[in-house]
Amino acid sequence: MQYFFSFAMSFLLMSIYAIACAVATFIENDFGISAAKALIYNNAWFDMLHLLLGLNLIGVIFYNKLFQKKKYSILLLHLSFIVILIGAGLTRYFGLEGGMHIRENQSSSTIVTREEFLKITDFDTNASFEFPISFTPLTQKHFEKTIDLNGEKLIISSIKYTPQKDSITPASLKLNINYQKANTQIILNPNFTNKQVVHFNLQGKNFTINWGPKEIKLPFALHLKDFILERYLGSMSPSSYTSKIQIIDKQNNIELDYDIFMNNVLDYGGYRFFQSSYDQDEKGTILSVNKDPGKIPTYIGYTLLILGFLWVLFDKNSRFHRLSI
């Protein structure tokens, strides 16, 4: 136990963490953010690494009595890492990434997540169940999920995933579904509007299933008053595009006009809206949406980290100061 709460273990865990982040960067560059999340960021072993590193840093503080005045600079460094880890945890488990599509003179209060889900609904009870799934060029794992329906098990297992070949042939997912010893096989295509579902019947019970993102309702709406696209002189290439929107928050009796364009984002209600793309007829906008409750703790952690390093450099009790004498 004493070795686990040592500076040597801290160095080892931080080295593993740094290597994992570096590998994730290369994976993201070559295969996309979804592959990096599936293999590194959202993987159970990376969560465990966060936990071990946090416990190690807390243990080091107490085992080495860093609360002493002469060790305050080292204490600040350790506390900064702990705050950064807390911020990362908040982002991991409570953060949200998605998009919002709005046509001119229309309003939307719905975010469509980037993460894809498999959603199944029992018509008899109107109960719905959903769980995230992810298929990337590097992660095409078999999965099996069991759902309890009043004591009876509904088992959904993947058989084969076929990635998208071109713009005409979409990706497909072949599933086997078992209920009360009855089986059926279903082929799904990703459904990004959540309006198309597949119906099936097992042992007299009716179900629907679909594969696509989750829709999240916001407590406020955005109304697109106008979308403006500007082009380079003598060219059809867009130089900039702006979404002139109105925030409609009935709960707080707020109506506020705002322009969203490149490098000018909207922060409202804990969400951040970026200008992402637009419809081909130039009558609609596509906004990227981000909710990151770990952003502020992470910024605080990095600020403390910088202050801690500066303090260590000039602290008379630090090893750096003694070596410089």
Question: How would you name each of these model-derived features?
Answer:
Residues G99-D292:
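Soluble non-transmembrane domains of integral membrane proteins
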Residues S6, S10, E28, F67, ...:
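Intrinsically disordered or highly flexible coil/loop and linker segments, enriched in small
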Residues L12, L51, Y72-L75, L79, ...:
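Active-site-proximal structural scaffolding
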Residues V23, I27-S34, Y41-A44, D259-I325:
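Membrane-proximal extracellular juxtamembrane segment immediately upstream
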Residues M1-Y41:
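Hydrophobic alpha-helical segments
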Residues A38-F117, N290-R322:
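Internal alpha-helical transmembrane segments
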Residues A8, I27, F31, N64, ...:
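Hydrophobic alpha-helical segments with strong N-terminal bias
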